[in-house]
Regions:
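Non-catalytic accessory segments flanking enzymatic or RNA/DNA-binding domains
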Residues: 1-275
Length: 275
């Protein structure tokens, strides 16, 4: 089969597929026109060719670009678009719960003045993070977590960010993609230990927002994991060909340890040949 369009980040289903694995879809676009989703778990084990002809389109305006900013945007879009507001990366900066917008009032009301989780996930190591309650479990799929647990629920983003900042004193908020792309063994006892340590570290100030939930576990469609990761970009390698060994997080895992971050290439127009 053949697929052609502008890449967007991989999307997943809330429920695992019949094999108990995270179910992935490629939801690209024809410049700005959304394309039908293509289920891609079945691509694992197949020969894949990805051809990049040099065209990149801004995912906001459709403008032809030489380089992208903030996941497929032009510099102007990245500077002005609501989805690139600073409180996306630094939740503690949001002020929309006070009625103050940093960039776009309606967008921030819809996305940031909403209930949020603070969570711990196991990617390559254990990390703390923040996400809207409606983004569960997709956020965990995106980062390639093998397990995760929500430990607090707040009424708005800034407060979740405040909790996260406090927990960054004992936990990282970053994912090491090379460690994540290894065959990470689920460690629920360690996750539960971190949960209790976080509660203890936060203390009574944030206790009203604590929640006691069971961890969730995720399996990914991977035949074999790379022993040594070699990250590919279409700017440097415009033609990628090989056996697709798996999908984890936002990465396609090819043979010979080569990996490609699909989200990183949002806006890139490609042709994909499968089989």
């Amino acid at each position: 089969m053949q697929w052609e369009g502008n890449l967007r980040k991989l999307e997943t289903s809330a429920q695992a597929n019949e094999h108990g694995q995270v179910a992935y879809s490629l939801r690209g676009a024809d410049v700005l026109q959304a394309l039908p989703p293509e289920e891609i778990n079945a691509w694992v084990g197949e020969r894949l060719q990805i051809h990049f002809g040099g065209q990149i389109h801004c995912r906001v305006s459709g403008q032809v670009l030489r380089k992208t900013y903030g996941e497929g945007m032009s510099y102007q879009a990245w500077s002005e678009h609501p989805a690139a507001v600073e409180s996306v990366l630094r939740p503690e900066l949001s002020r929309i719960h006070e009625g103050i917008a940093l960039r776009d009032f309606e967008w921030e009301q819809k996305h940031h003045n909403q209930p949020h989780y603070v969570y711990i996930s196991q990617t390559g190591a254990f990390k703390v993070g923040v996400t809207r309650t409606t983004n569960r479990p997709y956020r965990w799929h995106d980062q390639g977590a093998v397990a995760a647990v929500a430990i607090a629920e707040t009424p708005y983003r800034q407060l979740a960010g405040e909790v996260e900042v406090a927990l960054k004193e004992i936990l990282s908020d970053k994912t090491n993609f090379r460690k994540m792309l290894a065959n990470v063994e689920v460690d629920i006892p360690a996750l539960e230990d971190w949960k209790e340590e976080c509660f203890e570290h936060l203390g009574s100030v944030y206790e009203p927002f604590f929640i006691d939930e069971s961890p969730e576990i995720f399996a990914y469609p991977v035949l074999s994991y790379p022993e040594k990761v070699k990250s590919l970009t279409l700017d440097k390698v415009p033609h990628i060909e090989g056996t697709l060994e798996g999908i984890k997080g936002q990465y396609l895992l090819f043979d010979e340890g080569r990996v490609m971050n699909v989200r990183r290439h949002s806006g890139y127009r490609v042709r994909i040949d499968v089989g």
